[in-house]
Amino acid sequence: MKIIQICGTNGVGKTTLVKGLLSSGNFTKFNIEVDGVSREWWYDGSTAVIGKYNDRNCCGVDAGNYSVDGLIDTIKAVICQNKPDCVLFEDVRMGTSYAFKDKLLRTAYVVGYEFNVLALIASLECSCNRVMERTGNPGANFDAMRGKARAVINTSKRIGEQGAKVFFIDTEKNSKAAVLNALRRLTNG
């Protein structure tokens, strides 16, 4: 049983990947109340996906304005209620934080799950172009995105040294179908 964090900078394809998983399966949307806040999640009987997914640009747990503790409490509630084989979520903000990944690793251990990180990467130019295509805003901050990309890679490697399983996938060099198949293998394996 696994908890999977899908992380990466803006424009690497996190939301595209999760929306692809949701649309290719038999997922049903649910709400769960955690600490007085209603949180969206999706479930197909085996895999639980936490986060908001609609036609917005900002999806996942970033769209739900989750705090670290709020996300961890939601993961625990979904596990307690349904015992899914896999719980996954995608984010930008928490994907750059080693402290958050460490807290998730410890939480996974406590609830009897394995913690996996699926870090999506692409060149800075590719990521910025995708963001500009999506938002129409040509003012992508290359320095900020470069810093986030480094943080995603470095924190992912570091948490791997602590016992998490870490996988890097280049979404620029691999097709959407190949990336989706890699996620399916990870959720089923």
Model-derived features: positions:
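Switch I (effector-binding) loop of TRAFAC-class P-loop GTPase G-domains
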Residues: 25-44
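Conserved glycine(s) of the Walker
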Residues: 13
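Small-molecule kinase domains that catalyze NTP-dependent phosphoryl transfer to phosphate-bearing small molecules
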Residues: 137-178
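The conserved Walker
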Residues: 10
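Hydrophobic anchor at the beta1->P-loop junction of P-loop NTPases
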Residues: 6
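Conserved nucleotide-sensing/catalytic segment adjacent to the nucleotide-binding pocket
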Residues: 39-94, 98-99
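Conserved phosphate-donor/acceptor-positioning beta-strand/loop module used by diverse small-molecule
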Residues: 91, 111-131
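A conserved segment at the C-terminal end of the G1
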Residues: 16-28
